């Protein structure tokens, strides 16, 4: 239910700025007719696009600022230059102030994460944030995290990611007990880093309401073996970019094959419906929109190079998680981890020592 929801938009974020943001808001407003938008950015650049979309214009308010964060800015630069004045900062701050239930930005990922952490702060029992998104699979979709927020996560943090990802999956898939798997180089218990093995041990032994499947490998992501795939941001981001590259390669191969001869062109026309269905399945815009989990507020990251269709999908994600009160569900799940803090911290220290010794040996 979207009644009463207000979404804050970074009107200047991404490669295409207001054109994509306003176009996406227009598409989203059809799917969510009761939604309202607070759009932050340069009014002289935003209003011309807004006036082309009267439906969005009627449910939007522009909050002017001529300061924006570029895609090239380092997080430290963005914080220094855009603190309290940039369109990205103001959109996130609207969530903190309770003026909006979620913020959506297609801007610089590092800057967005840095600002979100400064403004919203981390939840209790969470050390690092995780970026979670929907991933198309042979069985439908799964949740994968972390996709780049925390480059190196230890065992304790991976367990936190598992709890947050499980709550996210319950909300977006509307299922009671999603299955959770840890991404690893093999299914055997002896394989993997000390952190991954420690996380698996914790998830097996802890009295948590999580259906832990065990380890999953890279090919299990596309198979949809589990509902939630948990990994660190370094591995997750590489997996994401690899998958995006493979999709582009497959599409290029198909286009080349369909144009290779007259017979191929005729075959394409005969199978046009099937190709359209395949293209829809492979379209990354449908899965656009990743949520920063672990913060005291909802921030959704849209792909910087997406178009209006993709940005609308990111708004859809914001609406879904805000409507389902995702934050309270995550807090409840994380409270169940608080009793494990002492024992996990001890094992975490042992894990850190073991990894250090492995590096030095």
Swiss-Prot record:
Keyword Lipid metabolism listed? The answer is yes
**SUPFAM superfamilies named in the record:** Isocitrate/Isopropylmalate dehydrogenase-like
**EC supergroup of this enzyme:** transferase
Q: Which InterPro entries match?
A: FA_synthesis, Phospholipid_synth_PlsX-like
Q: Which reaction does it catalyse?
A: a fatty acyl-[ACP] + phosphate = an acyl phosphate + holo-[ACP]
Q: What is its EC number?
A: 2.3.1.274
Q: What GO biological process terms does the UniProt entry carry, in alphabetical order?
A: fatty acid biosynthetic process; phospholipid biosynthetic process
Reported function = Catalyzes the reversible formation of acyl-phosphate (acyl-PO(4)) from acyl-[acyl-carrier-protein] (acyl-ACP). This enzyme utilizes acyl-ACP as fatty acyl donor, but not acyl-CoA.
Q: Family assignment?
A: Belongs to the PlsX family.
Q: How does it assemble?
A: Homodimer. Probably interacts with PlsY.
The protein here is known as Phosphate acyltransferase
Source species:
Parvibaculum lavamentivorans (strain DS-1 / DSM 13023 / NCIMB 13966)
């Amino acid at each position: 239910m979207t009644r009463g929801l207000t979404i804050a938009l970074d009107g200047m974020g991404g490669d295409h700025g207001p054109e994509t943001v306003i176009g996406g808001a227009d598409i989203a407003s059809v799917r969510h007719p009761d939604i309202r938008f607070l759009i932050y950015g340069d009014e002289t650049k935003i209003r011309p696009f807004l006036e082309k979309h009267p439906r969005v214009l009627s449910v939007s308010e522009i909050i002017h600022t001529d300061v924006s964060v570029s895609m090239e800015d380092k997080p430290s630069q963005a914080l220094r230059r855009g603190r309290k004045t940039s369109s990205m900062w103001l959109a996130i701050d609207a969530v903190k102030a309770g003026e909006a239930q979620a913020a959506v930005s297609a801007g610089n990922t590092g800057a967005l994460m840095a600002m979100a952490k400064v403004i919203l702060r981390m939840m209790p029992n969470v050390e690092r944030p995780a970026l979670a998104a929907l991933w198309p699979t042979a069985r439908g979709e799964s949740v994968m995290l972390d996709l780049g927020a925390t480059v190196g996560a230890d065992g304790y943090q991976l367990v936190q990611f598992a709890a947050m990802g499980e709550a996210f999956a319950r909300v977006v898939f509307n299922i009671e007990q999603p299955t959770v798997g840890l991404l690893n180089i093999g299914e055997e218990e002896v394989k993997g880093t000390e952190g991954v093995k420690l996380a698996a041990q914790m998830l097996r032994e802890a009295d948590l309401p999580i259906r832990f499947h065990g380890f999953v490998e890279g090919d299990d992501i596309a198979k949809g073996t589990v509902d939630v795939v948990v990994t660190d941001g370094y591995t997750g981001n590489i997996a994401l970019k690899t998958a995006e590259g493979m999709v582009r390669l497959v599409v290029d191969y198909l286009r080349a094959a369909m144009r290779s001869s007259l017979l191929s062109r005729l075959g394409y026309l005969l199978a046009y419906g099937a190709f359209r269905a395949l293209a829809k399945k492979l379209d990354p815009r449908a899965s656009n929109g990743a949520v920063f989990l672990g913060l005291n507020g909802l921030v959704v990251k849209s792909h910087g190079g997406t178009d209006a269709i993709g940005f609308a999908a990111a708004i859809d994600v914001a609406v879904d998680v805000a409507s389902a009160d995702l934050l309270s569900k995550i807090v409840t799940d994380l409270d169940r981890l608080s009793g494990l803090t002492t024992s996990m911290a001890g094992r975490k220290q042992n894990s850190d020592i073991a990894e250090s010794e492995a590096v030095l040996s």
